[in-house]
Amino acid sequence: MKKLCLLGIFLAAFAALVMAGGQRAGGVVALRFFDVSPSPERQAFYTATFAKFRTETGIIVTYESTPWDDAANKLTALGVSNSLPDVMTFWEGWLGQFINAGWVLPLEKYISGTESTYTDTIRNKLWPKQKQLYGAIYTVPDGLMVKGIYVRKDWAQEKGLNLDPDRGWTYDEYFDAIRVLTDANQRHYGVSYRGARGGFDPLSVYLTGFAGGRFYDDRGNILLKTPEVYEAFEKWTNLYLNGYSPRDSINWGFVELVDNFTGGLTGTLLNDSEVAATCQATMRDDQWMVMPMPRSKDGKIYNTVNAPYSYSISTHSKNQDAAWQLIEFLNRSDNSIEYCKMGGLIPIKTDLTGDPTFGITGTYRAFVQQLNDPNMVIPTTYGPFNYTDMHQGMMHEEIQKYLLGQQDARTALDIILNELESRMKKYMVDNPSYQIEQPLANY
C-alpha cells in the first residue's frame, strides 16, 4: 500500500511537471502547445510536425486545443491560474488583455537578426503596428490573411453580372450585386451576413473608410459619429433587414457563413483568404471566384492584414528558448508552405513568395494583388486597451437588438462607439506617452 501511495505521488508530480512545461525524466524538454482553432486537418498537421520536431531536436511537444468560441475564456482561466501553455496560437485582439496581465513574452531578443527573412508586410506593417500599440513585438504570424469577397461565379454569370477582380468595385457595386444575386424563387440569398460574434469587425472597416481609416483623433475622440457613418451603418445592416440574407443569419458565425456559401444558400461571403482552401475542397472552379474588398468613397481599399492565429510564448513557460525554437521550426519553409496551403494563408517568409500558388495568377490572386495595391490602407484597430469582453458580447449584441427592433440604429452604434471612446481616453490618461495609432498605407 505504501508503494502504491509513493507511486501515486510520483505520477502526480510527473504530471504537474509536464503541465508546467518543465523537464521530463532524464532531462528531456517537454512543451505544451495550445491551438485555439482546432480541426482534424490542423491537429494532423501539428501532430506530424511535432513528431518531426522531436526527431530533430529531442524536444517533446504536447498538443492541446479548445474550440474557438471557448478559446478566450479558456486561455484567460489558464492565465489566472498561472498555467498557460508554452506556445499558443493567438488572436491579436486579445493582446491588450494578456499584455496588461503580464501573460505573454516580448519576442525582440529572438527576432533580432532574422528580420530580413520575413516579408515586407511583416517587417514594415504588422510588427511596427504592434510596437506602436503595445511597445514591443509579442507574436509571430503563422501566415497572412487578407480579406476579400467570395462570389458564386455561376450565379453571377446567370444574372449577367460582369465582375472583374482587376477592375475591382465600389461598396455600392458590391451592395447592388448582393441585391441582384438574391432570388427568392431559387432560395438564393445574396450575402452570408455575420450577425453573431465577429460581425462588427468587417463593418467597422467599412465605417472607418469614411474617416480615412481611423477610429480616433489625436485626443482619443471617436471619429465615426457623423451623418455619413450612421447612414453607412444602416446601409450595411439593411443587407439583413431587407431579406438579402436568411433570417437566422442574425446568429451566424464563421462556420455558418462558410457552410452556407459553399453549400449554395448564399451568393457572397466577406472573409479572409483562409476560406479559399475550403472552397477548393468543396466547390468546382466554375462555381466561385474572389473579388478584392470594395473601394471606399475616397478610392482607397480599406482592408485588414493580419495573422489568423499568431504564435506567442507565455511568460509561464519554463522553457522559453525551446518554445522559440518550436516557433522557428513551425515557420521553417518546408513546414510553413504545407501549413499555408492547408489553411489558405499567404506565407510570411521571403523564400516562399515565389511559389506559384501565391502568385498573381494563382488561387490567391485577389488577395496578393491587394497587398501590392498602392491604394490599399490598413485601418487602425479598436485600440491598445483590453476589449475582449466587448468583442465577446457588446459589439454584436447591440446590433442584434437593433435588427430585432429593440432599439434604433443610432443607439446601437453609439453604445459601441461610446464605450470604445471611453476606454481609449482612460488608456491615454493611464499612459500619457501613448500616441494615437495611424492607418498604414502601401505607398
Residues covered by each model-derived region:
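Extracytoplasmic "Venus flytrap"/periplasmic binding protein-like
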Residues: A48-I122, D154-G160, D259-N260, G267-T268, ...
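A structural signal for short loop-to-beta-strand junctions that line the ligand-binding cleft
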Residues: A77-L78, S83-D86, E115-W155, G299-T304, ...
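Glycine-centered hinge/linker elements that transmit conformational signals in sensory
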Residues: F175-L181, R219-I250, M293
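Short, solvent-exposed loop/beta-turn-alpha elements that line the ligand-binding surface or hinge
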Residues: E108-R123, D166-R167, G190-Y193, G212-E231, ...
